[in-house]
Every structure is written in structure tokens, then in C-alpha cells.
Amino acid sequence: MAPALLLIPAALASFILAFGTGVEFVRFTSLRPLLGRISESGSPDARQGWLAALQDQSILVPLVWDLGLLLLFVGQHSLMATETVKEWMSRYFGVLQRSLYVACTALALQLVMRYWEPVPRGPVLWETRTEPWATWVPLLCFVLHVISWLLIFSILLVFDYAELMGLKQVYYHVLGLGEPLALKSPRALRLFSHLRHPVCVELLTVLWVVPTLGTDRLLLALLLTLYLGLAHGLDQHDLRYLRAQLQRKLHLLSRPQDGEAE
């Protein structure tokens, strides 16, 4: 195991990479389709129909390329989450196992965003071009995206993202406190095993609620929706624990205000 002076910069570098990738993901999934849709979308006359698109190489080739990028991301994200790979990584990288997983996931997502091929001439599932819908629908989508991202960031109040990002493992190791998950209750471990992507509904809103749902966006939304659906397995016990944790943390946040009131 590397000394602490090397562990801390490695964990911080992984976190910074993941944070930057998250900012880029906001631009990729929200800002580009909402604010750049006029310049990037093709005219209705230039678009192919659904049947004609299946025979057009200029549409099929970029779609296959985009599908390959998504499968690369999903494959990396799933393979490195298996117990066999995690045990192997823990054996050779120790407490950096989670940080390495986060860094590899961020790099895979960067590949998807950097090399994604738009399909402006492809068919669209829906589109708003006539007034008043061309004004109000993009505005409504923008508001829903802002709310969704705020909810995603607010989940930091409930979930231990320092552990999910790999920072807490290194911090505890340096202080000699052991494994962070070993200190959590069985109910917390049960919840984390069922839900490692605690932003499912919000991400689905971001993926699907857009003014123009073109072919490549439809591919992105469908595949990530399927992946998110398979990655979740919450039950009533998890929901009760999650509700109790939210109430407890909100109570802790309100304590200073109560003290000032007294």
C-alpha cells in the first residue's frame, strides 16, 4: 500500500475528475439540448422518416457509434462493480479501489460525451416548433431540469457521497479508523447494496424532458433508462430507512437555528 502522502492526492485527483465530468454531464444532457437546440437541430425538411432512416447510412453509422460508446460506459460501470473485480482491485490498490472505480467511470463518461455523434437528419419522436409551444415548452423543460439538478445535489444531505466518491476510504485509512462501511448500520448497508445510483427519477427527467427528442437523444434516454431501472431494487424497508435518515439530518440542520431562537 502506498504511503498516505500518495493516497490523498490520488483520491483528490479522482474526485476532481469526477466533479469536472459531472459539470460536463450537465452541459451534455441539459444545456446543449435546451439552449443549443436551434443551432444543432436540423430543419424538418432535411430529416428522414423512421423507415427511410433504417436504410440511410449517414444516420445508422453515427447511431451505431453512439451505441458503442454507451455500451462501453455501461460495460465498464457494471464490470468494475462486480464482486470479483472489486476484490481484485482491493487486493492491488487497497483503499484506492473506490477512487479508481470513480476515475474510470468518469473517463468512460468523458469518452461518451466527447465523441458523441449527433444525428440532425434523423427522425424525431417529438418537437416543438409552433407558437406558443415553441416558447413555453423549452421554458418548462428548463425549469424541470433546474429542479432535477437541484434535487440531485440536495441528495448529498442523505447519502454518504464522500464514501461513494472514495474520499472517505482514504481519510479513514490515514487516520487508522478502518473501512467506513464497516461502521454503518445493517440498514444502511442494505440500502447502499440496493441503490448505488440515488438519482434515478431526476436523471430520467433530465433525459426525457426535452423540447426535441431526436434519434440520438432517444438512444441515449432509452439505454440509460434501461440501465438505471436494472440497477435499482428498493423495497419498503429501504424507503423507511431513507425517510428516517432525511428527517434526522433535517433535524440536525435546524439545531443552530433553534439555539439562536432560544
Curated annotation (Swiss-Prot):
Regarding the membrane, this protein is recorded as: Multi-pass membrane protein
What parts of the sequence cross the membrane? 5-28, 59-80, 98-114, 134-164, 192-210, 217-234
What keywords are annotated for this sequence in UniProt? Answer: Membrane, Nucleus, Transmembrane, Transmembrane helix
GO CC, sorted alphabetically, is:
nuclear envelope; nuclear inner membrane; nuclear membrane
Where is this protein localized, as stated in its record?
Nucleus inner membrane
Perinuclear space topological domain ranges are 29-58, 115-133, 211-216
Q: Does the keyword Transmembrane apply?
A: yes
- Residues on the membrane's Nuclear side span 1-4, 81-97, 165-191, 235-262
Protein family membership:
Belongs to the nurim family.
Q: What is this protein called?
A: Nurim
- Organism field: Bos taurus (Bovine)
Q: Which gene encodes it?
A: NRM
